[in-house]
From Swiss-Prot:
Gene3D superfamilies tied to this protein: 3.30.230.10, Histidine kinase-like ATPase, C-terminal domain, MutL, C-terminal domain, dimerisation subdomain, MutL, C-terminal domain, regulatory subdomain
InterPro entries membership: DNA_mismatch_repair_CS, DNA_mismatch_repair_MutL, DNA_mismatch_S5_2-like, HATPase_C_sf, MutL/Mlh/PMS, MutL/Mlh/Pms-like, MutL_C, MutL_C_dimsub
Keyword entries, A-Z: DNA damage, DNA repair
GO annotation terms (biological process): mismatch repair
Species for this entry: Pseudomonas putida (strain W619)
Keyword DNA damage annotated: yes
MF terms (GO), sorted A to Z: ATP binding; ATP hydrolysis activity; ATP-dependent DNA damage sensor activity; mismatched DNA binding
Descriptive protein name: DNA mismatch repair protein MutL
Gene Ontology CC annotations of this record: mismatch repair complex
Length: 633
């Protein structure tokens, strides 16, 4: 510090402008603060008008409770709020805002006009400020019950901040994303957005499941809703509900991930880790899951006052929340079966043919198709009923899959060897298919094999195409995981124990979780305050870098209270075994073998994706086929 410098108080205008650096980053930041105030006021309709991406004009109008004339000047003062009174109030705060600094920060870097009227007032009142002039001017105005906030010329008095703004389209995209997030958080509020005089978004109140799904589709796209699983699970004071996208609807960027805690949009590391773990086995490298999820818990179980923008939260029982999120999502993804995608069939469903025989149908080298023969039975499809809309959604079939049983390790290894050896064409027996005419399995009955790669099958909805290698790879992988779980992990003692230098905190963590490491095949011994010895590692991971793996696991344990790194390494090895053991392309399968593969798919968790996240099968309904041939036009 210079000897001539003296300590002095900063002016209110300067302190507000400094604070604005945390609160007001761009027009989207302003929109977030104003919209949250509107929602906290009990608004049921919010209109947003924007010009030039929000830099020239951002106007937010609501029909909330309004602000009285006496409180208007105070509303623009820093740290003035109606939402908390004592420090203890923060433990149970449910409002989106509570610090009372947003309007003061915004008014210090823009020209702000606030007009409001309460239900008990006969007229509205208006207050204006212009950046440098921090003395508010209050005057009567015409306005319905509610509040309008108009922000013009953002950063007009701070040119350095204005230079960091992006192009108009970029700024508007950020602003629009803020509105989308809040519209997902509050289905009971209508949102309307206009940009440069053009209507961009119009969302009406959504009070039932259908309307909520329609709003999610309008914001996230119809493709998401078509590929999303609805979930709603409540346990031990925690409730998780919303929609999770199927792994086949993953994206190259994490731009379709919305997570809300008690109605507040958050981006939390613990939440992200739990979701990533749940999708671990079904996503291709570099792909990101999609979801719109809502977590509800007691307000005192989460601290929302840990980040200037309130994007991050801290859970009181972080480990319990993590395990609940992971377990719920993991189970939801694992329970997806083919029949979940086939809740209805087309109205013009044809008869299903059950071919049996020693040789599969296939396409020959010249492209001609050789059908399996002989065709012994043609069970009749049960009569379907047309729904009110005439779409054929009333068609129902009955099929009860056999219960899935844990596979002993010996059997899993036998299956691995059986599918890895060349096929003996004479060994295939007759197909074992349901005898009841009404028992049409979700994936139907195999018809033929295409180019030694795909299985063509017919079900109640139409045509099913199966990538036989990808499907069998998933089946083998799940069986090997079950086998490992039942047999446990054998350890490989090291001839020369490896020494590992750590911080004292990491060494304490390793000692605390010693039994957990032992169950996974590791034996760790503490040699000193900051030294560990690795005496044993899992036999399957003998080629892994033990030191680095243990350090990474300890980092996870200290951050999240759990780690999936060891299991991820093991699963990677099992996935390689399953890939090598799965039926190969250009291998001819008999009809009974193809049908056996279809039945195994119906009874295997996550069978819709291979180990790398690629789809294993797809459905083409009769409507899809009709469109290809222009039928019905």
């Amino acid at each position: 510090m210079s000897g001539g410098s003296r300590i002095q108080l900063l002016s209110p205008r300067l302190t507000n402008q400094i604070a604005a650096g945390e609160v007001v980053e761009r027009p989207a930041s302003v929109a977030k603060e104003l919209l949250e105030n509107s929602l906290d006021s009990g608004a049921r309709r919010i209109d947003v008008e924007v010009e030039q991406g929000g830099v020239k004009l951002l106007r937010v109008r609501d029909d909330g409770s309004g602000i009285s004339a006496d409180d208007l000047p105070l509303a623009l003062a820093r740290h003035a709020t109606s939402k908390i009174r004592e420090l203890e109030d923060l433990e149970g705060v449910l409002s989106l805002g509570f610090r009372g600094e947003a309007l003061a920060s915004i008014s210090s870097v823009a020209r702000l006009t606030l007009t409001s009227r309460t239900a008990s007032a006969s007229e509205a009142w208006q207050v204006e400020t212009e950046g440098r002039d921090m003395t508010p001017r209050v005057q009567p105005a015409a306005h319905p019950v509610g509040t309008s906030v108009e922000v013009r010329d953002l950063f007009f008095n701070t040119p350095a901040r204005r230079k960091f703004l992006k192009a108009e389209k970029t700024e508007f995209d950020h602003l629009q994303e803020v509105i989308r997030r809040l519209a997902l958080a509050r289905f009971d509020v209508a949102f309307h957005l206009r940009h440069n005089g053009k209507s961009i978004l119009s969302l009406h109140e959504a009070h039932d499941e259908t309307a909520r799904a329609r709003r999610v589709g309008a914001i996230c796209g119809g493709g998401f809703m078509e590929q999303a699983l609805p979930i709603d699970v409540e346990r031990n004071g925690l409730r998780l509900w919303g929609w999770v996208g199927l792994p086949t609807f993953s994206r190259s960027q994490a731009d379709l991930q919305y997570f809300f805690v008690n109605g507040r949009a958050v981006r939390d590391k613990l939440v992200a880790h739990a979701v990533r773990q749940a999708y671990r086995d079904v996503l291709f490298n570099g792909r990101h899951p999609t979801f719109v999820l809502f977590l509800e818990l007691e307000p005192n179980g989460v601290d929302v006052n840990v980040h200037p923008t309130k994007h991050e939260v801290r859970f009181r029982e972080g480990r319990s929340v993590h395990d609940f999120l992971y377990g719920t999502l993991h189970r939801a993804l694992a329970d997806v079966r083919p029949e979940d995608h086939l809740a209805s069939a087309p109205a013009a469903a044809a008869e299903i043919t059950r071919p049996t025989g020693q040789q599969a149908g296939e396409f020959g080298p010249q492209g001609e198709m050789r059908l399996a023969s002989p065709v012994l039975e043609q069970p009749q499809v049960p009569q379907h009923s047309i729904s009110n809309g005439g779409s054929g959604a009333g068609y129902q079939y009955q099929y009860t899959p056999r219960p899935s049983q844990p596979l002993p390790a010996a059997e899993a290894q036998a299956v691995y060897r059986e599918f890895y050896k060349p096929l003996n064409d004479d060994a295939a027996g007759p197909a074992t298919l349901p005898q009841s005419q009404g028992d049409i399995p979700p994936l139907g009955y195999a018809l033929a094999q295409l180019k030694g790669i795909y299985i063509l099958a017919e079900n109640a909805a139409g045509l099913v195409l199966v990538d036989m290698h990808a499907a069998h790879e998933r089946i083998m992988y799940e069986r090997l995981k079950v086998a490992m779980a039942s047999e446990g992990l054998s350890g490989q003692p090291l001839l020369v124990p490896e020494s590992l230098a750590l911080s004292q905190r990491e060494a304490d963590c390793a000692e605390e979780h010693a039994q957990w490491f032992q169950r996974l095949g590791f034996e760790l011994q503490r040699l000193g305050p900051e030294t560990l010895a690795i005496r044993q590692i899992p036999a399957l991971l003998k080629q892994a870098e033990a030191n680095r793996l243990v350090q990474d696991v300890l980092a996870d344990l200290m951050e999240y209270g759990t780690s999936d790194r060891i299991q991820a390494h093991l699963n990677e090895l099992l996935g390689t075994m399953a890939c090598h053991g799965a039926v190969r392309a250009n291998r001819r399968l008999a009809i009974p073998e193809m049908n056996a593969l279809l039945r195994d798919m119906e009874n295997t968790e996550r069978s819709g994706q291979c180990n790398h996240g690629r789809p294993t099968w797809t459905q083409m309904g009769l409507d899809d086929l009709d469109k290809l041939f222009l039928r019905g036009r």
